[in-house]
Amino acid sequence: MINIKAGKSGYFSKPSQTLDPHLFDGEHLKPDVRTRLNLLLLDYLDYHYHNAESWTMVWLAGSGISYQWSADRGNGDLDVLFGIDYDKFLESNPDYSYMSREEIAECIDNDLRISLWPKTSHINFSYDAEDYWTLGQDYEVTFFLNPMVDNRANGITNIRPYAAYNITLDEWTTKPPKTPETNFPEEFERQANDNKLLVKTLSDRYNSINSDRSMSIPNSPRYINAQTHVNHIKAEAQSLYDSIHTGRKAAFQSNGGGYSDFYNYQWQKAKADGLVTTLNEIING
């Protein structure tokens, strides 16, 4: 039985008075945090490619470095985004010269997901006397190459980040607001409620037809008919999920509204309302 249950998103949470003290001294990223994140990425890139430091610019980004860091956001995640100088990359890695900018980014991101992410799913930045990183807060750190981000001091502003700290240069590119947006247009809330009603309808239909399928003899006409309906519902759930998730990317394009854009609001509200989890349960059910 699939039912909508409240989810998690720090987007609507009350901000803290300070940035995460496990990561920052005041507004400055702690040197050991900066060094470790930088080395995790550059060591990986240097192992798989050549001369990474010459073509890479690295940022820490997202709500984890905002004043809403203490909210229950599900995973305690940190996003490390980087941009590259594609001309310099190709000079050092000529085997990729036949690929487009987007194809290179996709290739590197796929490698990161497979080879680096599993090793950075539990990262701790507190150092004890026995040389183990075992104290303090655990973080799930994910690394991304965004083809829209350039290898220059403010290159990440192309995707309108809510907050971005330049790890390479050790400075803020985009400081997070101390008082995030809380007054959203009624149209935003209306669309979010429509999404919730639609997901409720899909889950109710799925539960009813799936129950009928489970009581049918496998491969009987009744079973096959129920399976066909289930597949249609899964396709509808996938389409809705894709529209909400993919739509969020529009918020961070050059002509988007960034963190307060409707499409980001819609995604965050879908997470907070449990719609993302429910849709995935239907899709994978």
Please give the residue ranges for each predicted region.
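Catalytic core of pol beta-like nucleotidyltransferases
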Residues: 2-75, 83-285
